[in-house]
Amino acid sequence: MQVPKNNIYTVSRLNGEVRQILEGQLGKIWLNGEISNFSTPSSGHWYLTLKDHFSQIRCAMFKGRNQSVSFKPVNGQQVIVKGAISVYEPRGDYQLLIESMLPAGDGLLAQQFEALKMKLAALGLFAADTKRALPKNIQRIGVITSPTGAAIRDVLHVLARRDPSIEVIIYPTQVQGENADINICQAINIANQRLEVDVLLLTRGGGSLEDLWCFNSEALAHTIYNSALPIVSAVGHEVDTTISDYVADVRAPTPSAGAELLSQDSDNKSQRLATVLARLKQSASHYQLKQERRLSLLEHRLQRLDPKRTLQQFEQRFDEMQLRLEAALTNKLHGLSRRQQQLASRLEQQSPKHKLALEANRLSYLATRLQDAMQDKLSHSGQRIKYVAHQLETVSPLATLSRGYSITTDVNGAVITSASQISLGDTITTQLSNERLMSTVTRLP
């Protein structure tokens, strides 16, 4: 036997190349097997053997990975693991480095979950550009959950503490077990038909993967995606993730976190009240200025017109505008008052009574000033109209006639200013202040 000179492997080289081949070709795999020889040394790492009826393989799961496992493995337990094949070169043993571990039942569900997740992602149901923003001023929240579970108690407690003015409408549904996903879809569809809430909160407490499985339904994913109402998914605990979390517009880690996300504390409510009152004040001021400009324009047009009838029409229009202005301002003030009362009632449990009293006094003071300013402006406008009417009467031809003058016209209505315009026997008309005279020409100069 001739020994080659340049192609002799060392043991380390052989084990290294075997490791590269195994790791490069197999990559990450899922493996089902029974645990044996399970050990937990002081390092915190796990060492075990996975076997079936015919074969076995050594496995290792390091401390950084096994801390995320939600159960304590025991010998004889069937599990599904995900990991990568590697070679432990010092001994030449090949082994599986485990990254995640699930009980055998949950493992099958996890595979189904990953498959559905990939399918829905490819259809675009998780796309960020399809997510809708939550309403800024939430008045009603629709909660889709079991009416007797811990989740609804947590949600109601948080909302009562943070913002008792928010109304809650519960759409009761089954949240675990057979047909639970169908019941949830029906509740979402009912809420979309009624359109009586601003946002939907889909929620339930924690549980095993099997307990939460109804939230991993493909039908439920499409129902959430097609909902006209924005949906917040708050299912389980922070470590739990469901398909509904991926499809929903917003995901909250717990039911309580979902309620906090959809509510504001009382301090923010007070700030919003002050902002609303300031905007209403500005709106009333702008409306008054607009009406003043309109009255000024009417006065200018009135000065360019002559007859009393036109003046009377403008006076009538002015009266109508006055009534409309008074009604508009009254409605504004009533609206401000109603809004203040509503907000005061909503904030009563948070006891912002002192701030509301100050704002109410301020509103009353502004309303009084606005009313006084309106009356002053209307009085001033009335006086100006009377002055304009007097000026029009002064230059009117009828005023000239009332001072003893007269106007004579021929049968065609032409004003006679010279005797040369008439002949003997012509009929002429003389207009006095309040009556007319008919005459026949009998003599000419």
Swiss-Prot record:
NCBIfam families for the chain: xseA (TIGR00237)
Annotated organism of origin: Shewanella oneidensis (strain ATCC 700550 / JCM 31522 / CIP 106686 / LMG 19005 / NCIMB 14063 / MR-1)
Keywords: Cytoplasm, Exonuclease, Hydrolase, Nuclease
Protein name, UniProt field: Exodeoxyribonuclease 7 large subunit
EC id: 3.1.11.6
Pfam families to which the protein is assigned, alphabetical: Exonuc_VII_L, tRNA_anti_2
Cited HAMAP family: Exonuc_7_L
Biological processes annotated in GO: DNA catabolic process
Gene Ontology molecular function terms on file: exodeoxyribonuclease VII activity; nucleic acid binding
Uppermost EC category: hydrolase
Subunit organization: Heterooligomer composed of large and small subunits.
Taxonomic classification: Bacteria, Pseudomonadati, Pseudomonadota, Gammaproteobacteria, Alteromonadales
Record localization: Cytoplasm
UniProt similarity note: Belongs to the XseA family.
Superkingdom of this protein's organism: Bacteria
InterPro entries given in the database record: Exonuc_VII_L (IPR003753), Exonuc_VII_lsu_C (IPR020579), OB-fold_nuc-bd_dom (IPR025824)
Gene coding for it: xseA
GO CC field: cytoplasm; exodeoxyribonuclease VII complex
Function recorded in the entry: Bidirectionally degrades single-stranded DNA into large acid-insoluble oligonucleotides, which are then degraded further into small acid-soluble oligonucleotides.
Catalytic activity: Exonucleolytic cleavage in either 5'- to 3'- or 3'- to 5'-direction to yield nucleoside 5'-phosphates
PANTHER family xref list: EXODEOXYRIBONUCLEASE 7 LARGE SUBUNIT
Major subcellular location class: cytoplasm
